[in-house]
Amino acid sequence: MTATSPSLSPHLAMMGLSDGWQSVIRLDERSYQRSQDPVARLSDDFRQLCSEISASPCLVFCADDCPEFADSSLCELFSHWLTIDDVTSVSFCRAVFLLDPSLESGTAENMSKDSFPGLRDLGTTNVIRMATNGLQGLRSGPYFYQEASFHHMYRVFPDSQSAFFSAIAQNPISGQFIEHRPTDHVAVPSRLYSPPQNSKLPLSGLRFASKDVFDVAGLKTSAGSRSFFELSDPKPKSAFIVQKLTALGAVLVGKVKNTQFANGEDPQEWIDYRCPWNPRGDGYQNPDTSSSGSATAVSSYPWLDFAIGSDTCGSIACPAAAQGIFGLRLSTGALPHEGAFTISKYLDTSGIFTRSIDILHLVTSKLLEGTSELGRSPPLSEIQTIPSRIVYPKSSFPHDNDETIESIDRFIKALESFCSTERTTLDIDEEWIKTDPHGHKLSIYSELKTTTAHLHLAGFYDAIEPFQKAYRSTYQKNPYLDRVNTEKLKLARLVTIEDREKMVRQKALFANFAQKQILQSSDGSGAAGSLGGIMVWPFNPQQPQYRDNQPPLTPHVNWRWDVDYTAPLAGLPQVIVPIGQFRYESRITGEPDFLPITASIVGPPGSDIALLDFVSKFLIRTRGLLSVKPGRYIV
């Protein structure tokens, strides 16, 4: 039987095949897709009994979730589903299947809907109680029933902010990832298909998106470049971080966009793919740097729980701050970077974006369990999670916005009270000159002026030159590099062996300086993973950053030292915490509007879990923002 509109209930219309792997369906005011392959089929014993049920959305109730199948219990369970699952709706109530393992194999009963007045009032026309022959793989939840088969249902959400590179679903039988690209929508599965969270699957049912620098098994990686995607082969396995997250139960729903080769670019400089739209304020703000897609997806869509990104020199902190969400840059080396497109082996690490400190803490703690020596922390009960030192580098950042400075001051006062210690206002440049790691008595702005730039350029050369050679060999032409990357490669070719050796020495000196002189966390008295000292400063752009600004042509290379480079240069964990909003006059709308204010907190290398545990407890105690809203404003 082929499903067509006349055979469906009045509120359902089949829209045909969208891309060869799912059918698009309208249920009332919502769009859905069903899996092409069924997750279960009825045995011949049951087909005649169910023959009167045409292609239809349906609900499945398993005895484990509702043992007695009483009408009141079924209605109560369904009501609960509506609160926890954005796929389930009343439209699925038309047909109800009760899977009862106590029934003799091959037996089933078409029950009177009058015995289920609550379900009847919800629109149920068929209630079938049956043995579980061949249906053991079904979980309670919403499905699409067609030709004696049950299909998973995915709710289709528009990608209104152009954050996604592709939508991804995982075949529930084979485990194969299936990609739909290009896409203007994302289809997400019911959360009810995932088992309850437990010790083996602590992230079960959480939906996430991946920056398209991380490999996904069976799919190609673009790294933000059409030429790179063209040359790429489907990957034999997923990147380590993707493997770990899915093994913990998280559900991958798509890849999100990034700048070409994950380099810093302004919105007008994106060429191969369209820059995502930051939803905050007037809607015309810069989403900021290479992980823009990851941050935009999280700041825009309530149906997405978290996203992963990569960081070379600010690609976690910058978009998290610009979009007012929680972001964590993991300690460099805390997680294997295997299967990720890498710019600099000295700087690159992974990161996580969420709207909730609880989800950030949960995902990070489970992700880092048993991954590396740096990522392995002792139990929190055995380490120091309240910092003994709060550093405020007041002279090292701009003071362009009074609301931002006042907000960060209130935030630090609350930290002082919570930690029972006063801030240490530190001039990092003065401390550097006093410590004099190089023995030159020079300013940090002079000694480290080229360090970050050379680290970035050397890594960029090492990543792009082999790609260009392989592309020319395959296609007998050069791959496309946008203007930013073309200029960057010119500079990268000028980096000498001496420059490389010097930058590695300088990075090591700064990392030691940051730990011993700034955080004062390397005295040997604390357990691995303990906090010791933290440094706090405002990270948000203190003025509007409009996406239609026409930037001058630059390679986006940082020929300077900046406090914002502390985490990548010293390999520290960095968490971005939304703390408020500042008012501005939008030149787009001509009206007053608001943008996020965020604080940056860094801790010692390897203290990722302890740092998040501290931030979570602090926000709870001081009634800070535990979560932010998606959309125009954070609160």
Regions found by a protein language model. Give the residues of each.
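Short glycine/serine-rich loop/turn segments
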Residues: L201-L347, W537-T554
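Electropositive, surface-exposed helix/loop patches at the edges of structured domains
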Residues: Y284-F306, S344-K345, T349-G351, D462-T486, ...
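Short amphipathic alpha-helical segments and helix-helix/interface helices
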Residues: A239-V242, S294, I412, Q515, ...
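Extracellular/periplasmic catalytic domains that process cell-envelope and extracellular macromolecules
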Residues: S199-L203, T246, V298-S300, Q384, ...
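Beta-strand elements of modular eukaryotic interaction domains
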Residues: Q197-K200, E230, K237-Q243, S525-G526, ...
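Structural helix-boundary/capping segments
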Residues: T2-S18, F306-I405, D409, A414-S417, ...
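Amidase signature
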Residues: M1-L201, E369-W561, P630-V635
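Generic structural signal for individual residues within well-ordered alpha-helical segments
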Residues: Q243, H361, E501-V504, L612
